[in-house]
Amino acid sequence: GLVIGILIFVKMINGKATRNCNIMDTVYGEKNMAISSLSFSNGATSGSEELQPLCYYYIKSAYNCCSGGNYRNDYVSLCSLQDLLKQGVRGLDFEIYSINDEPVVATSTVDNYCVKETFNYIKFSDVINTIVNTAFSDNVPNPNDPIIFHLRIKSENKTMYKNFSQMLQSISNRLMGPDYSYEYKDDQGRIRNFGEVNISKMMGKIVIVVDRSNTTCLCDDCEEDCGEFYEFVNMTSNSTFMQLLRYSDIEYTQTPDDLINQNRRAMTIGVPNKGANPNNPSAAVMRSLGVQMLAMRYQMVDANVEENDMFFNEDGHAFALKPLNLRPIVTVIDDPVVQNPALSYATRTVEGAFYKLDV
């Protein structure tokens, strides 16, 4: 009886990956025709509604985008990623681990670089191949839009980072290029706000965002150990210009006005709370506070996911402009009135029959 029970359990576990894929294919397998790529007319100017900085947009995003089930005792798969791309999702969050000195995708519920809690993993090289071959093809509704990688790297293995950089080098034509390297540093080595870069510069490109809570290889002088990994990083989260917030920190913030004002020019990625099977955040609440990257758990089909999908479908794009009241407040001052020279405070000469004064 014990042997039979073990065999049944193993069969159930092995079938879980297939069931996850079947569910994702059923719900998300058809291309979402309500979404299309952003487009810009040749006559558009920097002040038009057509051309705006990245931080002005809500971005359709997925948390742990290769997960088709729970974050513990479950599976990750490329089928989940492929189905989300068909729905127009362009913000892709990954949890990265090091196995055999290679970057791999898995999930976990513990903050431990040595523990992954999925039964399997996906090589990040396979993720890159899927993105390059699918995300910019006619298999998705918005192939010209940017892809934003949000990488939460759970490793300090510098050899893995070096191998990671070689993978990124192999698709350098799809990345943002040297003008946006090293966290978009200027000529003096100062980190700039990548969120202020116009989204038109990113069309058809992959943007690399790395969680700065792990600073391994996020350094200018570590190429010997880390390869060129930092060169490919356009922005970091958990940093000055981009927050990484769990939903509870957004929903119960004590200073909502501060969060709104920060998100006028800086950025925030909002993600579900911790746990093996957390609830979806309310994208409506996150949008009301100006949060840009709305990272949902698409494998949990609930009212919050449906509301979020409806919002982007009605907008028609995976990058939806935030309302004016959540963007930077621009104060326009009228031209000053031309002054009467006779009323000037400039020194003038006053004289009479018996005096001459400069006043």
Features from the language model and the residues they span:
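Long, acidic (Asp/Glu-rich), low-complexity accessory segments flanking structured domains
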Residues: G1-G91, S98-V359
